[in-house]
From Swiss-Prot:
The keyword Kinase does not apply. Keywords: Cell inner membrane, Cell membrane, Chaperone, Membrane, Protein transport, Transmembrane, Transmembrane helix, Transport. Pfam families: 60KD_IMP, YidC_periplas. PANTHER family: CYTOCHROME C OXIDASE ASSEMBLY PROTEIN COX18, MITOCHONDRIAL, OXA1. The gene is yidC. One of its GO terms (cellular component) is plasma membrane. GO terms for molecular function: membrane insertase activity. CDD domains: 5TM_YidC_Alb3, EcYidC-like_peri. Required for the insertion and/or proper folding and/or complex formation of integral membrane proteins into the membrane. Involved in integration of membrane proteins that insert both dependently and independently of the Sec translocase complex, as well as at least some lipoproteins. Aids folding of multispanning membrane proteins. It comes from Anaeromyxobacter dehalogenans (strain 2CP-C). NCBIfam families: yidC_nterm (TIGR03593), yidC_oxa1_cterm (TIGR03592). This is Membrane protein insertase YidC. One of its GO terms (biological process) is protein transport. The lineage of its organism: Bacteria, Pseudomonadati, Myxococcota, Myxococcia, Myxococcales. It is found in: Cell inner membrane. The chain crosses the membrane at residues 8-28, 325-345, 355-375, 421-441, 458-478, 497-517.
């Protein structure tokens, strides 16, 4: 490779590496957005329907305000939901199975997709103030946690009755038999005229929680309210302060995004508005679906999905639900490629029954696909290696005159029809695969907590740093086998600094990506050794011919 071209490649790789390292070691909090238009400037809709003068009182009496809490558990496919009489809502939803566990202090617990704090309503509670004229209207709406009565229950369903503002409300939760799914039927009666009721999905996250950087994924407990309107999926930042925000259009679902998981409510038909408000404490907020109530009554069928972000499952719901998978700023560019890699790895994992082995086989497949190009590249590198004696003579001839020496080296390459950029090709071809695999590891729940050898989770970094060190050693060997630049200082940097710097970066990235790069390095070394052995008997080009 020509000296100038090596400098360009080295500068590019180091720049990307420094950016990756900075983002991984110093993950930033989510930056604040510009303050939205205060909801006070938006015309508020009519209040919830009130009974007409002289109309009969609703048949459903309100429970005493100090009624003790009752809970009911429903076991669904892959989850256990705990429902509470406080708001007739979802108090807990724990995912089942060893895969869906997380470390909490000194023990492992099941992942719970309900994240609320004191004073917040529970998910799927109803509010008489869905348009959020002020944060206190709904984020701390006492009516949203008002006690309801359990009027019916069995092994697969529970029905609550109570009041929402001036409306009588009947809510029935049912286990559908589908993975991670509940059905919620709502019946509102006893009003007059037109109004609006909100279906709430609150969330809470400690304010000091880091969101991750461009190249570093968010922690497992990083949560954000999310809404889908038309073709836009908007995630709301719980860390910042500001007035309520409105998402207008055909709102098809709303809920809470939690890295590899999503909990969302999907109405049978799109509604007109999703509103997000912060409070009652910092780090807390709620997304509300505004449901029109016409003529003082409304029946509503809702689907609740709370589980892993499996791409095929989310696509099965339609409504753009697969956009719940957030590929991030950089990874989004490689999203299609990442999905392709994931499908290949799924196929391989179905055969070998281990995701680590599937990544190794993926590495082999990619090498086979790229073999024609990498073979030509290594041929070019071997031709450059044969010219090393001539390059040494030029170094002795021109001494410290680097400009003349570099010019003479380039003329030597041209004379023997050697492409100095050929050695860059293997790395350049692999970089899109690296980014796509990184995107797959950060967004694909299939790989979450999947073990390989000493690693318990391929989506997390190697806890013992064995793979990064092995990868660094293999990178050093690769550099030793590559033709060295004529510039001694540059040669030392390529030989020592580059593998060392790359090793430091790999300390903090998912173990699955480090495994891929390490195996790819080993295959490159083997291929290079075989080619060198095959071409060792070939005559060295003469400078004067």
């Amino acid at each position: 490779m020509g000296p100038d071209n090596r400098r360009i490649l080295l500068a590019t790789v180091l720049s990307v590496g420094i950016l990756i390292l900075w983002q991984v070691i110093f993950p930033k909090k989510t930056p604040p957005k510009p303050a939205p238009t205060p909801a006070a400037e938006v015309a508020k809709p009519a209040a919830p329907a009130a009974p007409a003068p002289g109309a009969a009182a609703p048949a459903v009496p309100a429970p005493p305000p100090d009624a003790p809490e009752e809970t009911v558990k429903l076991a669904g496919k892959g989850f256990e939901a705990t429902l509470t009489t406080y708001g007739g809502a979802l108090k807990s939803l724990q995912l089942e199975g060893d895969k869906f566990r997380k470390q909490e202090k000194d023990r492992e617990v099941q992942i719970d997709l309900v994240h609320v704090t004191a004073g917040q309503p529970y998910p799927l509670s109803l509010s008489a103030s869905p348009e959020l004229g002020g944060a206190a209207d709904v984020t701390a709406d006492p009516g949203a946690r008002a006690p309801m009565r359990i009027v019916a229950k069995d092994a697969s369903s529970v029905t609550f009755e109570g009041r929402v503002g001036n409306l009588a409300a009947r809510k029935t939760f049912r286990v559908t038999g589908k993975p991670y799914e509940l059905a919620l039927d709502v019946e509102l009666t006893g009003g007059a005229g037109n109004g609006t009721v909100g279906v709430l999905y609150p969330a809470f996250m400690p304010p000091d929680t880091k969101s991750g950087g461009i190249f570093s994924g968010p922690p497992l407990d990083f949560v954000r309210p999310v809404c889908r309107a038309g073709t836009t999926t908007e995630r709301f930042d719980l860390a910042k302060e500001g007035a309520p925000e409105k998402l207008e259009g055909q709102v098809s679902w709303a809920g809470v995004d939690q890295h590899y998981f999503v909990a969302a409510v999907l109405p049978a038909e799109p509604v007109g508005t999703c509103t997000f408000a912060r409070g009652p404490v910092k780090g807390a907020g709620v997304a509300a679906l505004a449901i029109p109530v016409e003529g003082g009554a409304r029946k509503l069928s809702l689907t609740v999905y709370a589980g892993p972000k499996d791409l095929d499952t989310l696509r099965g719901y339609g409504r753009g639900f697969e956009s719940a998978i957030d590929y991030g700023a950089v990874a989004k560019f490689f999203a299609l490629f990442a999905r392709g890699l994931l499908y290949v790895m799924r196929w391989l994992e179905a055969i070998v029954r281990n995701w680590g082995v599937a990544i190794i086989l993926l590495t082999v497949l990619v090498r086979l696909v790229l073999f024609p190009l990498t073979y030509k590249s290594m041929q070019s590198m071997n031709e450059m290696r044969k010219l090393q004696p001539e390059i040494e003579k030029l170094k002795a001839k021109f001494g410290d005159d680097r400009e003349k020496m570099n010019l003479a080296v380039m003329q030597l390459y041209q004379k023997h029809k050697v492409n100095p950029l050929g050695g860059c090709l293997p790395m350049l071809l692999q970089m899109p695969v690296w980014f796509a695999l990184y995107a797959a590891l950060q967004t694909s729940v299939e790989l979450y907590r999947e073990p390989f050898l000493w690693m318990k989770d391929l989506t997390a970094h190697d806890p013992y740093f064995i793979l990064p060190i092995a990868m660094g050693i293999s990178s050093f060997v690769m550099q030793k086998l590559s033709p060295q630049p004529a510039d001694n200082a540059q040669a030392k940097m390529m030989l020592y600094f580059f593998p060392g710097f790359f090793t430091v970066i790999m300390l903090f990235v998912p173990g699955g990506l480090t495994l891929y790069i390490f195996v790819n390095n080993l295959l490159s070394i083997v291929q290079q050794q075989l080619m060198m052995k095959h071409q060792r008997a070939a005559p060295t080009p003469a400078a004067g011919k």
